[in-house]
């Protein structure tokens, strides 16, 4: 185990962390703001990647392809929202149904189980090759970092508007929101569309970065997103109180997740166990507040 090998691999881990961080922000919107466990993510990841790759293979501009991937993700969120609000299906089951449907959709989009794209033949925005020894205009880490900052700024502005505040109120207290005349069903659909749109954008970047799209590339994505959210909150929660900084904490959580993942691989731990380790990490951080309240909080004495 040479330390130089680990150092060489760290920039790639940071790049992946930034890309998946955009997806994690989407998960944050549903999980923390709307208080919905949305499992559509596992299918949307592949849908966005498939749309982006196929459009670029058809000769479309990279920005147009990424926009199409984002819109495809928003349509997936719309489907989940309709299942949940219009048809009365529980949110978690609605996400599973959409995810299941997207598997067939993704196969139809790509025509087969996977599609590759060559960085030498196509003008990709990001790539695994463009991490080191590149100018800032081509450096993957710099480009994705700028995109993350812009997205956080846009989301910070949006959730400060009247519509954004009503969306946050819907997740915080839906009954009170309805009493104030807020259309909570519409807000849930909108939140799911924004969330999955971000997932679609993230997957478009991921497909370019790794050079292919695959129907199984989204498996376990929700665990990665939750891990980024939970790690970011656990480490930076006491420091980052502002909404924009909380979104930034999610990005940092994603980067830390991939840095730890890279260290685990460098240490020679069986990679087949990585998904299980990720699930255990998420379970631990989700359970910690409960354990803290139940086992470590001193009982109040004499009504004090």
Where are the regions that the model predicts?
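Membrane-interfacial amphipathic/re-entrant helices at transmembrane-helix boundaries
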Residues: 1-23, 59-64, 132-138
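Helix-loop-helix "hairpin" substructures at the membrane interface of multi-pass membrane proteins
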Residues: 76, 137-218, 222
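Transmembrane helix-bundle core of multi-pass membrane transporters
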Residues: 91, 95, 99-160, 190, ...
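Cytosolic-side transmembrane-helix boundaries in multi-pass membrane proteins
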Residues: 172-179, 183-186, 245-248, 260-304
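Alpha-helical transmembrane segments within multi-pass membrane transporters and channels
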Residues: 60-100, 105, 148-149, 252-253, ...
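Transmembrane alpha-helical segments in multi-pass inner-membrane proteins
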Residues: 199-203, 209-275
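Membrane-embedded helix boundary and interhelical linker motif in transport proteins
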Residues: 31-86, 134, 239, 266
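Loop-to-transmembrane alpha-helix initiation sites
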Residues: 16, 92, 119-121, 140-145, ...
């Amino acid at each position: 185990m040479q330390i130089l090998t680990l150092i060489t691999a760290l920039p790639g881990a940071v790049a992946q962390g930034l890309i998946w961080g955009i997806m994690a922000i989407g998960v944050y919107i549903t999980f923390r703001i709307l208080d919905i466990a949305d499992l559509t993510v596992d299918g949307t990841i592949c849908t966005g990647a498939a749309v982006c790759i196929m459009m670029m293979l058809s000769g479309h501009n990279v920005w147009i392809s990424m926009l199409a991937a984002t819109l495809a993700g928003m349509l997936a969120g719309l489907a989940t929202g309709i299942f949940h609000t219009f048809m009365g299906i529980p949110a978690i089951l609605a996400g599973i149904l959409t995810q299941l449907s997207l598997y067939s959709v993704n196969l139809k989009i790509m025509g087969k189980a996977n599609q590759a794209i060559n960085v030498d033949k196509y003008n990709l925005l990001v790539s695994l090759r463009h991490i080191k020894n590149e100018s800032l205009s081509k450096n993957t880490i710099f480009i994705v970092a700028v995109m993350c900052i812009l997205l956080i700024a846009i989301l910070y502005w949006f959730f400060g508007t009247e519509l954004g505040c009503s969306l946050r109120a819907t997740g915080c207290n839906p009954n009170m929101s309805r009493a104030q005349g807020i259309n909570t069903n519409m807000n849930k659909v909108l939140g799911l569309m924004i969330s999955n749109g971000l997932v679609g954008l993230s997957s478009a970047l991921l497909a370019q970065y790794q050079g292919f799209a695959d129907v199984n590339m989204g498996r376990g994505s929700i665990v990665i997103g939750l891990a980024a959210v939970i790690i970011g909150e656990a480490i930076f929660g006491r420091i980052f109180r502002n909404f924009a900084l909380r979104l930034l904490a999610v990005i940092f959580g994603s980067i830390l997740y991939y840095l730890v993942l890279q260290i685990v691989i460098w240490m020679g731990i069986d990679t087949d166990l990585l998904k299980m380790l990720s699930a255990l990490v998420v379970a631990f951080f989700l359970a910690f507040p409960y354990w803290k309240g139940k086992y470590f909080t001193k009982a109040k004495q004499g009504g004090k």
